[in-house]
Amino acid sequence: GDGKEADNRHTKNFIKKLSEVDKNGNALIDLVLVILDGGSRDLGTSYELINKVIISNFGQGKENRILVAIHQANMAMKGRNWDYAKNEPNQRLVNFLEEKVRSVRDRVYEATGVIVEPIYYSAGYKGWGEQSRPYNLSKLLYYIVKAIPSEKRAIRVPWFYRCMS
């Protein structure tokens, strides 16, 4: 979005960072979390980044190291079909979000052969007297922790995994 020259520079930096390894040859980057805008219809640039930059340059085990999250689930249909009292999508919005998940999964798989399992969430907000609670944020955190190699986790909380199963 910053122009062709800046996009090329960012792409080279991504590839360089994804290729970095430690002294034992292990990748320094364990996980890439790609956050897509739930309200956007044009995800072409995002697919190009996922398919041509991240997946193409991520090395071994990429299937388990790429997470895709669709942010602003509450705004995916411009704020319609969100039950603000229950802080959750109604069935029409769930269907819309599930279709977006399926579309992202299928487009990535068709282009790369890599299976990703996108999730949707809303981070919530607070300000100027308004407030919205997070939705599916703990699920996103669970997916992140689950995807990080256990030996690199700073903390191991067995109850967290039991409650998320």
Residue positions per predicted region:
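Conserved GTPase G-domain substructure that encodes guanine base recognition and part of the catalytic core
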Residues: 3-165
